[in-house]
Amino acid sequence: RTRVMDPHLSVPPLACLPFSATGNCELQYMAGVTGLREVRYGLAGANHLKSTKDESNPYFTYDASKCIVCNRCVRACEETQGTFALTISGRGFESRVSPGQDQPFMDSECVSCGACVEACPTATLQEKTVIMLGQPEHSKITTCAYCGVGCAFKAEMKGNEVVRMVPWKDGKANECHACIKGRFAWGYATHKDRMTEPMIRKSIHDPWQVVSWDEAINYAASEFRRIQAKHGKDSIGGITSSRCTNEETYLVQKLVRAAFGNNNVDTCARVCHSPTGYGLGQTYGTSAGTQTFKSVEKADVILVIGANPSA
């Protein structure tokens, strides 16, 4: 095993052996497991040490000088994401991972799902947040708040600051994969424009005023009562966002029906999911998904609609 690792460590910079900036470098870890402390082949032959780092993607960098051409990223893009944005170009010492047709990542078909970054055993593909903030010190399992799919993530943190969001391997809804939003676009949680305190205003022309939660809730309740007294109980309704969890959506409809006394409740997810929701409801009695990815492996029959599995 040591001899197998030796050629791999002759490709990236030799500083990889003692280097710990990436924190999860599999190549470095396996070198330690096999007892490899120095390489025999050196850097006299062809290599990629003078390759220019691709920083075109806003979320991660691609440093070809650290690549061992293991093909993991290519397979992740093909087999996990299904985008086929990466390939191995060249032959022999000229072999390298190529986005598109030797293009920068942002000019290729890459959708920034992060599957290649997660699969990379070195620091060739690395999150920019890790480079800027350093290595995470602890983590916590959480759920993505972007939509109702419920993808599970491991929030890796340094103190109280999120360093990166990694798709959780045991996530029932995503199984260690995610889209660009959950994987990289979580900065809204700490964005300077995010409202962190309750605010009220008497009219649209008045400035917002920061108040306590009790004052905000009492003001909202009094205004709802005033509107219903003037325009009737059907004058108020509730619409939930597709970012809401099932529990939050349930509470909104309960508030509208129990407190406001009407059925004026809806969710924006109904518009795009109404056909599938109706079909599932008629067939299974519920409009929500009833299976996990694991259950597909045990299915006797799989019906695929609107796709070309042979492509």
Which residues does each predicted region cover?
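Fe-S ferredoxin-like electron-transfer domains
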Residues: 1-112, 117-143, 161
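Catalytic alpha/large subunits of respiratory electron-transfer oxidoreductases
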Residues: 13, 70, 131-311
